[in-house]
Design a protein with these regions (language model features):
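Core nucleotide-handling region used for phosphoryl-transfer chemistry
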Residues: 1-184
Length: 184
């Protein structure tokens, strides 16, 4: 803010799209250009024998479905040496105690998809386009309990950083509505 004031430049107005916070654990699928894949948590590669809240066991339990997703990506989308990382929240069931989602079946909710050739070359994808491309255009079966963050209601707000308090009441209303009746 002080740099903008110093240069006599107004602060930006930014549009934000938010989703409901899902209380679970971060998980990902990493799919290589050759169709091979593995699971990972935020910090490490996981397997059914060395798992994170049962995510790898669920993925490997649906191995045929994930093999089809990987085959679709590797033959139709990925270039040589490229990988795709599919990030999401593994939630529901007994993954987190004392949260509303614990009464729902376990599910993987994708919130981010990234294509990369190395750490420097990354392209984040819109999950809705990816969902359409893989599961609708190619007709690849969707694994059970797989969702996308935008399958549930999202919330759009515009923040004018010159007057950020103008959006404060709207944010409180959204928060209270979700607390009263979570849309997930």
């Amino acid at each position: 803010q002080s740099a903008c004031a110093y240069h006599n430049v107004p602060l930006p107005t930014v549009d934000f799209r938010g989703t409901v916070k899902l209380h679970g654990t971060n998980a990902a699928m990493v799919i290589a250009h050759d169709g091979t894949w593995h699971c990972q948590s935020r910090e490490r590669i996981i397997t059914p024998q060395d798992d994170n809240a049962g995510f790898a066991a669920w993925v490997y339990g649906n191995k045929d479905d994930w093999d089809r997703v990987a085959a679709t990506l590797s033959t139709a989308i990925l270039s040589d040496e490229e990988t795709v990382q599919v990030y999401g929240e593994w939630c529901g069931g007994n993954i987190q105690k004392n949260v509303g989602l614990s009464h729902l079946p376990k599910m993987f909710v994708i919130f981010g998809i990234r294509f990369s050739t190395d750490a420097e070359s990354t392209a984040w994808q819109e999950t809705n386009k990816w969902k359409h491309y893989v599961f609708e255009h190619y007709g690849t079966p969707k694994p059970s309990n797989l969702h996308f963050a935008d399958d549930f209601p999202t919330y759009n707000v515009t923040v004018d950083f010159n007057s950020p308090t103008l959006v404060q009441n709207q944010l409180v209303e959204i928060t209270e509505a979700v607390e009263k009746d979570c849309p997930v």
